[in-house]
Design a protein with these regions (language model features):
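N-terminal accessory/interface modules of nucleic-acid-binding and processing proteins
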Residues: 1-328
Length: 328
C-alpha cells in the first residue's frame, strides 16, 4: 500500500470506529462554538492559524476527534514563524492538499500538447495546545482575527461573530440561499427534486430532548435538506458525480448522497456555530456507510469533497457573510 493510501486508510478507519462506537454522535467533535478571551465566538471547525482559513473536505476528518480548547492548527515551520515551537514529543496530524500542476503530454501522432496532472500531498500540522504558544492561544487567535477585520473592513469580516447564532441569524442564512421552503406536511422533511422545494415540519412541532432543543433539531435537518437541494446542475452539480450507478431509495447511491448531506449539514452547522444533531433516520444509514467505507475507503474523500462544494455554494448565496470564517 502506498504511503498516501495508508494515511487515507488510517483516517477512514478512525471514522468507521466512531460510526460503530458513537453511532449517531460520530460527528459531534465539530459541533458548536468556542468563546475567545475577548468574548467573541468562533466555530469549532479547525482552521489554519496562519492563513485563518478553515480546513475543509477530507481534512475535516483528518483532524476529527482532536479535542482541544481552540481548533487552531499550523505546521511546525508556521509555528516557528509565529514565534513558537512545537513541544518535544508531540505527535502531529496528517492533512492533505489536492492540486493540479502543468505537464506536457503526447498524442497518438507524437504531437506534444499542454495538460495538467493531479496530485495529493500530505503534510503534518499541530494544534496550538501542543506548542509553546498554548498559554496565550486565545489572545493570539483574537489578535489575528482583529488584524484581518481591520484589513477587510466591517462589511467583509468573515471570521468571527460577537454572539452565538440566533434563530434570526440561521433564518437569514436559509433565506439568502433562495431555496423554496414549505411547511405543508407536519412530521416529514424532504427535498422534492422534480418541483425543487424542501418540505419541513413546522418549527413548533419539533420537541427537544437530552439537552438538545427543538430548534437544534429543526435547523440541523433543514441544513441536511439544503445540501440535497444543492445537487442540481446549476448549483453544486452533483447529479452526475455519484460514484454508484443506481440512486433509488435504498441503493448504494442513495446512501452515498445521504452521507454527503449529513457531512454537509455538519459543516454548515459547525461554520455557523450551531449544534449539529443527527437526522431521525440517521441510524439506518450507518451500517451501509460503514460497509461502503470498508469496501472503498476513497468514498470518504469523495463524499467530503462533494459536501464541501455544496457548502461553498450555500455560502456563495449569502449577502452578508459576517457569521462565518472564510473557507479554503
Amino acid at each position: 500500500m502506498k504511503n498516501n493510501d495508508k494515511k487515507i486508510q488510517a483516517v477512514v478507519d478512525k471514522i468507521i470506529s466512531l460510526m460503530e462506537t458513537e453511532q449517531d454522535k460520530w460527528f459531534k467533535p465539530f459541533s458548536g462554538y468556542t468563546r475567545l478571551p475577548n468574548n467573541q465566538f468562533i466555530s469549532n471547525q479547525p482552521f489554519n492559524l496562519v492563513s485563518m482559513r478553515n480546513y475543509t473536505g477530507f481534512n475535516i476528518f483528518c483532524l476529527f476527534g482532536s479535542a482541544y480548547e481552540y481548533p487552531a492548527y499550523a505546521t511546525y515551520n508556521q509555528f516557528k514563524e509565529l514565534g513558537g515551537n512545537v513541544n518535544k514529543g508531540e505527535t502531529g496530524y496528517s492533512v492533505c492538499y489536492y492540486g493540479t500542476a502543468p505537464t506536457t503530454k503526447t498524442d497518438k501522432d507524437g504531437n506534444a500538447f499542454d495538460s495538467t496532472y493531479s496530485f495529493l500531498k500530505f503534510f503534518t500540522v499541530f494544534n496550538i495546545a501542543q506548542t509553546s504558544l498554548a498559554d496565550k492561544a486565545g489572545e493570539l487567535i483574537a489578535k489575528k482575527l482583529s488584524k484581518i477585520e481591520s484589513q477587510k473592513g466591517d462589511k467583509e469580516n468573515l471570521y468571527k461573530k460577537k454572539s452565538i447564532p440566533t434563530v434570526a441569524d440561521l433564518e437569514n442564512f436559509v433565506k439568502n440561499t433562495g431555496a423554496k421552503i414549505v411547511h405543508r406536511e407536519a412530521g416529514r422533511c424532504f427535498y422534492v427534486p422534480s418541483l425543487d422545494y424542501i418540505n419541513m415540519s413546522p418549527l413548533d412541532t419539533w420537541k427537544g430532548k437530552n439537552g438538545i432543543t427543538g430548534t437544534d433539531f429543526y435547523y440541523s435537518t433543514l441544513f441536511h435538506e439544503l445540501i440535497h437541494w444543492t445537487k442540481t446542475e446549476e448549483r453544486a452539480n452533483r447529479t452526475k458525480n455519484n460514484p454508484f450507478d443506481t440512486t433509488g431509495f435504498g441503493s448504494k447511491g442513495y446512501a452515498f448522497e445521504e452521507l454527503v448531506a449529513e457531512i454537509g449539514s455538519a459543516i454548515t452547522c459547525s461554520m455557523l456555530g450551531h449544534t449539529k444533531v443527527p437526522m431521525e433516520n440517521h441510524a439506518q444509514y450507518l451500517a451501509s456507510w460503514v460497509k461502503a467505507l470498508k469496501d472503498k475507503p476513497s468514498l470518504l474523500m469523495k463524499a467530503s469533497a462533494q459536501a464541501n462544494t455544496a457548502f461553498k455554494f450555500l455560502m456563495s448565496t449569502q449577502e452578508n457573510k459576517m457569521i462565518v470564517r472564510k473557507v479554503a
